[in-house]
């Protein structure tokens, strides 16, 4: 659980880097290409995993909870106080803030489900976040394969997010699109 909480802290903390280092460059990464870039888990995941393990070290459940709360508060303040068209470092290249925020919403929805699943709870109700996450993953699917959700996932954003993010088996060979 500490590592999952540390992941929340790290993924939201990246927002402050983008806001703190505005660039006068053209964005080269958008919300969908961000996830296409991380889709090869064999290259990206080990680096992120080790960073998160290190980030979790020394924390207790209480200290990581406080840290994550502080990071989310700071990130939300930074987002609200920065024009959405601000361009800054977005992990894989320059990104607009609004495009980067969309990726943070996907992370929040997917890893929020990881957390509630681990606790045996239903997913937290986050309708706007769920809609945005599903839209981003729909776009990733459209760019990586044949567009369009499998028929059984039409109209069920949570089930689609779960399948598209590899949080459950689905017979469609196009899924998952991210890990």
Predicted regions and their residues:
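Conserved alpha-helical segments that form or flank metal/cofactor-binding pockets of metalloenzymes
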Residues: 2-49
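Solvent-exposed alpha-helix faces
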Residues: 9-10, 73, 113
């Amino acid at each position: 659980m500490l590592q999952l909480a540390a992941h929340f802290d790290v993924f939201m903390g990246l927002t402050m880097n983008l806001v703190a280092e505005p660039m006068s460059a053209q964005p080269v990464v958008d919300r969908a290409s961000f996830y296409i870039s991380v889709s090869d888990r064999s290259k990206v995941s080990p680096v992120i995993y080790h960073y998160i393990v290190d980030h979790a070290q020394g924390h207790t459940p209480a200290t990581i909870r406080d840290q994550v709360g502080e990071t989310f508060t700071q990130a939300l303040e930074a987002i609200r106080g920065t024009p959405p068209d601000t361009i800054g470092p977005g992990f894989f290249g320059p990104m607009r803030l609004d495009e980067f925020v969309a990726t943070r919403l996907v992370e929040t929805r997917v890893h929020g489900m990881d957390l509630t699943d681990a606790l045996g709870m239903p997913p937290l109700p986050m309708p706007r976040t769920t809609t945005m996450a599903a839209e981003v993953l729909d776009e990733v699917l459209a760019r990586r394969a044949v567009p369009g959700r499998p028929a059984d996932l039409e109209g069920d954003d949570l089930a689609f997010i779960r399948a598209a993010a590899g949080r459950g088996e689905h017979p469609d060979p196009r899924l998952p699109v991210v890990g």
